[in-house]
């Protein structure tokens, strides 16, 4: 078996803001395998300052994977515990290699194009007018669940944006999720959540920064809005530690990004730990290209979750890979008549 990797820079169509800053581009790496005339491809992508494997020896580790590809998937994954995004790329590349086609990883009614999956529409942070125009565009596009990034502009103005939505659509028509990316201070998080609760929100992601276990546990005890852990799950290895974290905090939901939590296997460990405690979950992409998004979407469909997933990020870039994934009326579907085009990766 031969393996190589290629770095690729994804360019955002518009600067995209979170409470951690504004992104104009995103680095990713493609891991390519070749054996007996068949090819496999996986994506290894990090989010700077967030991924636990955002470290100087990242590319060196990718080279090590290529040099040692004959160790096989399981042994490689065991050696890559501290590089969850490379675990995801390795899992996907090996699956791609043995699949009927390199991109049909989990054959299903979804990949046949006969069914679709509900997703949330993502509204990025920015100036009030920009956020308002995104909200209007998502609602016109048929989304029934939207997710707003909050914590970057003045909180009162963010409340006004929520008021704008609720004046036009009640919670029966539009489900709203908010993502604070840890922007609230522990001392005023509860008060802010109480103000947000007036707008009948589905959930709030990561209201305070990760690794404040006792403060997060208190917030989760009787929250005005259900709390979903996100960044809190990063860098937690092994099923015992996953169980322990969820038992301590007892959140209402967890959000799983395969590139940040150790690929499909790490995601399945978190789901098992959550379901034991009756904690809900959904899966989101971590701004991967369509290569990674396709893998995550097919995997997610196979798990049969009824909640809207966070998989609507394929249209963010000017130089993404053409693929059969399509979004229509708040649903993501796979159109088998559309072809993959990975020429710009060559």
Report each predicted region and the residues it spans.
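Short, solvent-exposed coil/turn elements at secondary-structure transition points
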Residues: 8-11, 125, 233, 287, ...
């Amino acid at each position: 078996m031969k393996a190589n990797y290629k770095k690729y820079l994804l360019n955002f169509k518009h600067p995209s803001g979170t409470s951690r800053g504004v992104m104009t581009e995103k680095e990713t790496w493609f891991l390519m395998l070749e054996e007996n005339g068949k090819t496999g491809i996986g994506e290894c992508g990090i989010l700077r300052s967030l991924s636990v494997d955002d470290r100087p020896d990242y590319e060196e580790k990718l080279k090590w994977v290529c040099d040692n590809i004959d160790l096989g998937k399981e042994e490689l994954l065991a050696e890559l515990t501290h590089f969850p995004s490379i675990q995801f790329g390795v899992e996907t590349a090996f699956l791609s290699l043995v699949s009927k086609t390199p991109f049909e990883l989990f054959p299903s009614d979804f990949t046949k194009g006969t069914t679709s999956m509900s997703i949330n529409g993502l509204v990025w942070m920015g100036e009030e007018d920009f956020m308002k125009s995104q909200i209007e565009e998502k609602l016109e596009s048929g989304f029934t669940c939207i997710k707003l990034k909050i914590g970057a502009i003045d909180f009162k103005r963010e409340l006004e944006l929520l008021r704008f939505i609720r004046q036009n659509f009640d919670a029966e028509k539009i489900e709203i999720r908010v993502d604070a990316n840890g922007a609230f201070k522990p001392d005023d998080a509860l008060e802010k959540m109480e103000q947000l609760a007036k707008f009948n929100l589905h959930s709030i992601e990561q209201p305070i920064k990760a690794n404040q276990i006792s403060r997060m546990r208190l917030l989760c005890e009787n929250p005005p809005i259900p709390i979903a852990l996100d960044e809190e799950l990063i860098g937690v290895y092994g099923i015992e530690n996953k169980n322990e974290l969820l038992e301590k905090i007892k959140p209402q939901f967890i959000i799983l990004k395969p590139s940040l939590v150790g690929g499909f296997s790490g995601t399945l460990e978190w789901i098992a730990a959550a379901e034991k405690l009756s904690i809900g979950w959904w899966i989101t992409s971590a701004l991967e290209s369509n290569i990674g998004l396709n893998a995550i979407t097919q995997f997610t469909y196979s798990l049969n979750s009824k909640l809207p997933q966070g998989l609507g990020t394929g249209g963010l870039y000017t130089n993404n890979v053409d693929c059969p994934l399509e979004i229509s009326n708040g649903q993501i579907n796979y159109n088998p008549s559309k072809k993959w085009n990975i020429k710009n990766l060559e």
